[in-house]
From Swiss-Prot:
Its main location: cytoplasm. The lineage of its organism: Bacteria, Pseudomonadati, Pseudomonadota, Gammaproteobacteria, Cellvibrionales. InterPro entries: Mur-like_cat_sf, Mur_ligase_C, Mur_ligase_C_dom_sf, Mur_ligase_cen, Mur_ligase_N, MurCDEF_pg_biosynth, UDP-N-AcMur_Ala_ligase_MurC. One of its GO terms (molecular function) is ATP binding. This is UDP-N-acetylmuramate--L-alanine ligase. It comes from Saccharophagus degradans (strain 2-40 / ATCC 43961 / DSM 17024). Its EC number is 6.3.2.8.
Length: 474
C-alpha cells in the first residue's frame, strides 16, 4: 500500500511556501525540516542567528534574522509558536493579508494525521524518550519520521523524514497544544507542576488536560504510561483507552529491575507481559530516570512488534541527545585526576535532582560543581523551596541570574535572593554570577582535580560548556 504523506493530499497541494515565525525554536525547526524534505518551500524568521538557523539555511530554508512584515510576502501559510506574541509584525501582516496562521502543534497534527503517530508527553523525559523510541524503530528497519526537542547525536539533527508510516514526536503540554495531536500511541512519562500559568494555577486542570490528550487516541489506540508516577497512576481509572504501564513498580506491565550503573553506562533488565522474554539491556546514559525513559521505549517497541534484537541494539547504539547529560570530556587540572565537564538541559527541580542522582550513582567519590541558571521568574517563584532544597545537595554551586525567557522580573524570584536563601541553610555557599561570560574565570578559580562540573539549565547557559571546553576549563 502506498504511504500517504501530507504533500500527497490534494487539499495540501495548494500550499507552496510555509513561513515559520520563530523558526530557531526546537519544535519549530524540526517541523520545518520535515516539511522541507517533503518538498515544500520553507522560510522562517528568528530574533537572532543560531546554530539551528545556520543549519536550516544550509539546507535551503530562507531564514530572516529579525521579525518584519515583509518576511511573510508570498507565504501560503504562517506557522507560529506560543512564544510569539500576537503583536508580532509578521502575524499582524499575515492577518492583514488573510494568510492562514496555524500553531506549531496544529502543523505537527497535520503531519501526524496521515501516519502512525507515536506522541510522547510528560513534564520530564520527553526528548530522551522520543529519541530512544526513534532509535529502536530505526534499528528495527522501521525508518521513522521523528521530530524531537533536542539534537539527536546520531542524526546531527532534531528531525528526520523516514519512508515508513511511523512518526515519533514530542507532545508539548506547556501550552496545552498537544491536544491538536491524534496519535495511535501516546506515552505519558510523568506529570508535575510546571507551566502552571497555562492552567491558571489549577493542577486539576493540568491533570484533566492529560486525560483529554489520551482520549485523542482512537478507540483502538494505546496509552503507555509510567506506573511509578503517582499522578499518572491516579489518572489511569479515568482513561477509557487500552493502557500498559512501565516502571520499577512490581505491578508494571513492563518492569525494569537489576539496574547497575558504572560511570555513564547502565545495564538493566526489563520483564515484559504475555510471555515475552525478559530483555537484558545496555544504555550509554546514566541515571535511573533514563532507565525509565528506556523502559518506556521498550514498551512502545514491544507493543509495535519490533524484534528483540532491534530493541537491544537500538538502546546499545544510542548516541544520546544534545544537552541531555552531554559529556564534553575530561580535562587536566594540575597534576591530579582530570575533571569531567557535562552539560544538561534540565531546569525543573525534579530534573536537576535526577542529574545529581545520576552523578552520585556513577561517580560517588567525585566532587560535584554545578553551574545552574534558573529558567523563568515564574518557575523560580512557584518552585522556590524545591530549588533551594535540590541545589543545596551539590558540593559547590555557581548560580547565574534567572534566564527570563521574555518574562518581567518578579520580586523575590531572582538568583540573588535564591543564593541568599541557600546560603542561610548552611550547607552550600553559592557563588552568584550575573552572566555566563563571567563563569569561566570563576571555574578556573574553584575547580579541583577529580571534579565533575555540570552546566545546567535551559537558557543561554547551554552555550557555556562549549566555551569552557575550548578554554580547557579556564
Amino acid at each position: 500500500m502506498t504511504e500517504v504523506t501530507i504533500h500527497q493530499v490534494p487539499e495540501m497541494r495548494r500550499i507552496r511556501r510555509i513561513h515559520f515565525v520563530g523558526i530557531g525554536g526546537a519544535g519549530m525547526s524540526g517541523i520545518a525540516e520535515v516539511l522541507l524534505n517533503q518538498g515544500y518551500e520553507i522560510s522562517g524568521s528568528d530574533l537572532r542567528e543560531s546554530d539551528v538557523t545556520r543549519r536550516l539555511a544550509g539546507m535551503g530554508v530562507h531564514v530572516f534574522i529579525g521579525h518584519h512584515a515583509t518576511n511573510v510576502d508570498g507565504a501560503s501559510v504562517v506557522v507560529n509558536s506560543s512564544a510569539v506574541e500576537s503583536g508580532n509584525p509578521e502575524l499582524m501582516e499575515a492577518r492583514e493579508k488573510r494568510i492562514p496562521i496555524v500553531r506549531r502543534a496544529e502543523m505537527l497534527g497535520e503531519l501526524m494525521r496521515y501516519r502512525h503517530g507515536i506522541a510522547v508527553a510528560g513534564t520530564h523525559g520527553k526528548t530522551t524518550t522520543t529519541s530512544l523510541i526513534s532509535s529502536i524503530l530505526a534499528a528495527g528497519k522501521k525508518d521513522p519520521t521523528f521530530i524531537i526537542g533536542g539534537l539527536l547525536n546520531s542524526a546531527g539533527s532534531n528531525a528526520g523524514l523516514g519512508e515508513s508510516r511511523y512518526l515519533v514526536a514530542e507532545a508539548d503540554e506547556s501550552d496545552a497544544s498537544f491536544l491538536h495531536l491524534q496519535p495511535m500511541v501516546s506515552v505519558v512519562t510523568n506529570i508535575d507542576a510546571d507551566h502552571m500559568d497555562t492552567y491558571e494555577g489549577d493542577f486539576s486542570k493540568l491533570k484533566q488536560t492529560f486525560i483529554d490528550f489520551l482520549h485523542n487516541l482512537p478507540f483502538y489506540g494505546l496509552a503507555v504510561v509510567c506506573g511509578d508516577d503517582p499522578i499518572v497512576t491516579e489518572l489511569i481509572p479515568a482513561i477509557s483507552r487500552s493502557v500498559v504501564t512501565y516502571g520499577f513498580n512490581e505491578d508494571s506491565d513492563y518492569r525494569a529491575f537489576d539496574v547497575r550503573q558504572d560511570g555513564s553506562k547502565l545495564r538493566f533488565k526489563v520483564a515484559r507481559p504475555e510471555g515475552l522474554a525478559t530483555l537484558e539491556l545496555f544504555l550509554n546514559m546514566p541515571g535511573k530516570h533514563n532507565v525509565l525513559n528506556a523502559t518506556a521505549a521498550v514498551a512502545v517497541a514491544s507493543e509495535e512488534k519490533v524484534d528483540d534484537d532491534a530493541i537491544q541494539n537500538g538502546l546499545a547504539n544510542f548516541m544520546g541527545v544534545g544537552r541531555r547529560f552531554e559529556i564534553y570530556g575530561e580535562f587536566e587540572v594540575g597534576a591530579g585526576p582530570t575533571a569531567m565537564l557535562v552539560d544538561d538541559y534540565g531546569h525543573h527541580p525534579r530534573e536537576v535532582a535526577a542529574t545529581i542522582a545520576a552523578v552520585r550513582d556513577g561517580w560517588p567519590d567525585r566532587r560535584l560543581v554545578m553551574v545552574y541558571q534558573p529558567h523563568r521568574y515564574s518557575r523560580t517563584r512557584d518552585l522556590y523551596e524545591d530549588f533551594v532544597e535540590v541545589l543545596s545537595t551539590v558540593d559547590q554551586l555557581v548560580l547565574l541570574e534567572v534566564y527570563s525567557a521574555g518574562e518581567d522580573p518578579i520580586p523575590g524570584a531572582d538568583s540573588r535572593h535564591l543564593s541568599r536563601t541557600i546560603r542561610t541553610r548552611g550547607v552550600v555557599d553559592p557563588i552568584f554570577v550575573e552572566g555566563v561570560e563571567g563563569v569561566p574565570a570563576v571555574i578556573k578559580d574553584i575547580v579541583q582535580p577529580g571534579d565533575i562540573i555540570i552546566t545546567q539549565g535551559a537558557g543561554n547557559v547551554g552555550t557555556l560548556a562549549k566555551e569552557l571546553a575550548k578554554r580547557n576549563l579556564g
